[in-house]
């Protein structure tokens, strides 16, 4: 346990000290290229808990965006395997290896069947004008043709994006229920840039709905921790307030464990959940915001789970397990 916390602390210092992400990416790319030389036979085989993180990132199926499966701000992966990624996710807990493996294998199967796994949200010109936008985009888990969509943003304190634990598994579950789910890879460094990326993601889906095969009616925004702040801000003020186009605000916002307190009288219906032992997002504070929305006549649902801390994701094996089914049901009530 002490070793794990020491590793996490070192990881966090590395993350917080990042001032030049592009240089860092170049360093990581060199490491990954070496890994590719060592693991030549990585094509479309399935992964398991012993598969190296670098091997997954370099799989041809992921076409260069495999780095976004894991916190890409990390400057090292070494011999890290899929059953030992906790050090990459210092703000997260209860990381379930079986879920990690299922997510990656599902993406490999989708690639094998010809599905597009990742979409850019910025044009090449926009990326040239602001090179930080290179590190953005969305994974896509396709549901039923013409079904509503959700965009999920993982947390990480705006220092890293914990998608492998806090948004990719959620998207997989939503797609199993027939819904189209996008996982946002946003820029780290602060809420403003992250919200701009979410606004652009919403605009991208609306503008390409026919190509993507999704309905823009009754969409939802999901997020955990920092990602929940993003979902809440876009729910309160809409994409135009953050540089996107004037598209509707979501039909529902699904939030996990955040101390976000801002709200408006026009907020969408909001589902929220948190652990009672959360030392980052106090559950009483989260409840205060939900009760304020209640008083405004906004439909809400709030759950707090015993013996549970911050960053539990799907909460597999915890008192929160199954919360996502409640959240889906809440969203479904507000789709029309």
Predicted feature descriptions by range:
Residues 268, 282-292:
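Short alpha-helix in the alpha/beta-hydrolase fold that links the catalytic acid
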Residues 200-267:
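Primarily recognizes the serine-hydrolase "nucleophile elbow" in alpha/beta-hydrolase
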Residues 272-274, 278:
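Short beta-strand/loop motif that positions the catalytic acidic residue
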Residues 22-26, 31-66, 296-336:
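C-terminal catalytic histidine-bearing segment of alpha/beta-hydrolase fold enzymes
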């Amino acid at each position: 346990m002490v070793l794990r916390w020491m590793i996490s602390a070192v990881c966090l210092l590395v993350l917080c000290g990042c001032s030049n992400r592009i240089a860092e990416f170049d360093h990581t790319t060199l490491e990954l290229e070496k890994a590719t030389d060592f693991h030549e036979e990585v094509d479309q085989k399935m992964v398991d808990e012993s598969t190296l993180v670098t091997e997954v990132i370099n799989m041809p199926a992921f076409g260069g965006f495999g780095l976004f499966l894991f916190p890409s701000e990390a400057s090292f992966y070494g011999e890290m395997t899929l059953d030992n990624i906790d050090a990459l996710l210092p703000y997260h807990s209860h990381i379930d290896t079986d879920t990690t493996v299922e997510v990656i294998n599902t993406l490999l199967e989708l690639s094998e069947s010809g599905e597009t796994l990742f979409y850019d949200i910025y044009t090449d010109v926009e990326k040239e004008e602001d090179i930080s936008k290179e590190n953005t985009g969305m994974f896509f888990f396709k549901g039923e043709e013409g079904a509503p969509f959700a965009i999920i943003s993982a947390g990480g304190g705006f220092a890293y994006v914990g998608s492998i634990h806090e948004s990719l598994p959620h998207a997989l579950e939503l797609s199993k229920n027939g819904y189209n789910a996008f996982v946002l890879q946003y820029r780290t460094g602060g809420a403003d840039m992250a919200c701009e990326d979410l606004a652009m993601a919403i605009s991208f889906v609306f503008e390409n709905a026919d190509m993507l095969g999704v309905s823009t009616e009754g969409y939802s925004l999901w997020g955990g921790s920092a990602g929940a702040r993003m979902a809440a801000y876009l729910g309160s003020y809409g994409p135009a307030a953050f540089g996107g186009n004037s598209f509707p605000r979501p039909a529902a916002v699904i939030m996990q464990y955040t101390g976000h307190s801002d709200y408006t009288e026009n907020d969408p219906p909001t589902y929220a959940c948190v652990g009672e032992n959360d030392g980052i997002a106090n559950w009483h504070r989260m409840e205060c915001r939900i009760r304020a929305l209640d008083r405004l006549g906004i439909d809400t649902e709030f759950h707090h789970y015993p013996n549970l801390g911050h960053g539990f994701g799907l909460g597999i094996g915890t008192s929160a397990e199954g919360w996502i089914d409640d959240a889906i049901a809440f969203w479904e009530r507000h789709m029309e």
